[in-house]
Curated annotation (Swiss-Prot):
Keyword Phosphoprotein attached: no
Encoding gene (name): thrS
NCBIfam families xrefs: thrS
Database matches in PROSITE patterns: AA_TRNA_LIGASE_II
Protein source organism: Ureaplasma parvum serovar 3 (strain ATCC 700970)
Subcellular location: Cytoplasm
Similarity comment text for this entry: Belongs to the class-II aminoacyl-tRNA synthetase family.
Annotated Zn(2+) binding sites: 272, 323, 453
Protein name per UniProt: Threonine--tRNA ligase
Amino acid sequence: MYKFDQKLNHSAAHLLAMALTKFYPNLSLAIGPTIDEGFYYDFNLNDPNTSITPLDLLKIEKEMKKITTQALTFDYEQVTYEKAKELFKHNKYKLDIIEQNKNNSLSIYHSGKWFDLCKGPHVQNTKEIKAIKLLNIAGSYWRGDANNDQLIRIYGVAFSDQDQLDAYLKDLQERKERDHRKIGKDLNLFTFNNLAGQGLPIWLPNGTIIKNQVQKFINEVEFQFNFDTVITPILGSIDLYKTSGHWDHYKDNIFSPVQIDNEILVLRPMTCPHHTLVYSNELRSYRSLPIRLSEHSILHRYESSGGLTGFERVREMILEDCHVFCRFDQIEHEVINAFKMIQEAQEGLGIKTFEIHLSLNDPNDKEKYYDDPQMWEQSQNVLRKMLKDHNIPYKEMVGEAAFYGPKIDFQVKTVLNRIITVSTIQLDFLLPNRFNLTYINESNEQSVPVMIHIGIIGTYERLLAILLEQTKGILPLWLSPIQVVIIPVNENLHTDYVKELNIKLRKHLIRSNVDLRNERLSKKIREAQIQKIPYQIVIGDEEIKNNKMVTYRCYGSEKTTTVSITDFINMLENKIRLKK
């Protein structure tokens, strides 16, 4: 096990800066904070002909370790604005920080003859830092603004003993092996191409199979819970999003509008405004509620290029999105119904909720949230009471609500201990009013329905990233793009029979492929293992002689099993049906 000590890592950042200053005396140090896992330091070499490579990290790290043995102390000194400016007069980044904090207390920390502008805190002396590792080099911008100077960033970690560092590095290697970007590339699931555009994913055939299988399953779940599927436009008029409030509260995430003829259109970032139009398409009665709608919609949301991360953060996404329009007295039933639907979907996908958050608004943030205190109090109390009445454990998270209402977030803990929101239930009293949605109540008068937003699995892109990380790419049979690979021992003698067997399997909707490449048998079997194909069948003279039998082996096993073709097909069909 390992534990990150913020004070220790902050001190290690100073050691990094000291080592850098020795090797690159003309550099300008920027900032060196701690982060969740370690530290980094940003700097400018001030020399276009000089660069830092991964090999340079070794000598820098060696110098840092040398400094730890010197038992240098970290000595605090409070300084005036004028003295701080004098000390750092040749460093524009430090001067920028000083100027920004001229009305606050300023301090520096000394270690021997070296010093840095810093608030602290630090360890007593450098000997407390027993284990250091510099991890990688990246680029950054001063103040995170692409209009400012481009800087170099070096990441590192520090621990109080070598065992913790070893454990962390082992964990880091495991993360790399589970990185959905690597697995997605190895299994040919998806790709990106700058010619298409940054953050715009291209689903390859194998990935599309997984997506379609998940969608088929989710469609079945939605059908069981009486949802009707709709299809709405990928574009929406700017007036649609002004009416919904997204333009005011979500504008930074909406792609720039385009004018076509006499309309101003935007790529839709949300489906909910479109679903209000489905509801308003006809007169509704209290007897016809609830109305339950679902859609697997393509959305576009702007993310900065620095925020794009594989399939986890993209600019185009496919969202599974459900909306319920109901009476006030139906809220509890519909929310519990949504709970059951989410639980069934997560169980089928092998996902387990770690904890539930009740995401509330921040009443002090008038810019982020719609300003209607009564609406917020009513909607939040409804969800809070429902969770308590049904003894559902939850945490309240202020400032995490949608701009239009509170939500229940289902948090999943991944094998790498990351907490990710997969499913949501959101209560909305705002949009029905903004779109003038009504129904005829029992008194033959108009009433406004309540809108409930439900995300069963979120986006398909993020879901696939989670599944790949959780399974290391070893997907269950029903999700595997290729379920069976058939390999002939001799391409010249066994090809006809192999093709016949492939046709037979495909008639039963089993996703089988034939490997007819002119390669060694051992190589084909090894590559089938690398591709994580659940079943491999090898066909030779003996199998053809007894043409009612097949010999197979499972992924990750050396054991072979011989069964009848009929039994093999029945076994696969049963596993697929049971989502195994």
